[in-house]
């Protein structure tokens, strides 16, 4: 499942994004809804193995010309105020990860208490885990 989603995400000919949320279980209980600073205090980093894809979609056309920061803020608003009918997760929250593929450049971003923290290497780790 994860490999199929990643393959489609990376091969997309248009801009797309993924919303990842922590799986339920004891291995995620201490990191769920924790800030990136708190993870660092615990000596942890976001682990792709602990996440599941809860949404995959084309990026809205009006995102064209926006910076990643602006696009991420728009997604935050969307997934908190007007979630798509086919979304099967909780509102976008601290500890979630948004993965953007814009103009052929992909990057992963941790939802932090304020803003987003880019996660270099996260996507590569996802590919290895899939």
For the regions a language model picked out, list residue spans one by one:
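Short, conserved turn/kink motifs that form compact alpha/beta structural patches or helix kinks used as
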Residues: 44-99
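N-terminal intrinsically disordered, low-complexity, charge/repeat-rich segments that act as generic
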Residues: 1-44
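Short intrinsically disordered terminal tails
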Residues: 1-2, 127-130
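A generic structural signal for short, non-catalytic loop/turn and secondary-structure boundary residues
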Residues: 10-13, 46, 93, 104
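Short, compact, well-ordered microdomains
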Residues: 88-126
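Aromatic side chains
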Residues: 17, 51, 79, 109-110, ...
């Amino acid at each position: 499942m994860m490999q199929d989603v990643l393959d489609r995400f990376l091969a997309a000919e248009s801009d797309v994004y993924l919303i990842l949320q922590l799986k339920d279980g004891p291995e995620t209980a201490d990191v769920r809804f924790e800030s990136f600073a708190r993870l660092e205090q615990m000596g942890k980093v976001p682990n792709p193995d602990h996440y599941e894809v809860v949404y995959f979609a084309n990026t809205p056309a009006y995102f064209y010309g926006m910076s990643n920061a602006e696009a991420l803020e728009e997604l935050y608003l969307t997934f908190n105020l007007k979630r798509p009918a086919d979304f099967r997760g909780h509102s976008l929250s601290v500890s979630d990860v948004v993965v953007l593929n814009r103009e052929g450049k992909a990057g992963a971003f941790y939802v932090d208490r304020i803003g987003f923290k880019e996660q270099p290497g996260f996507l590569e780790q996802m590919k290895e885990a899939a």
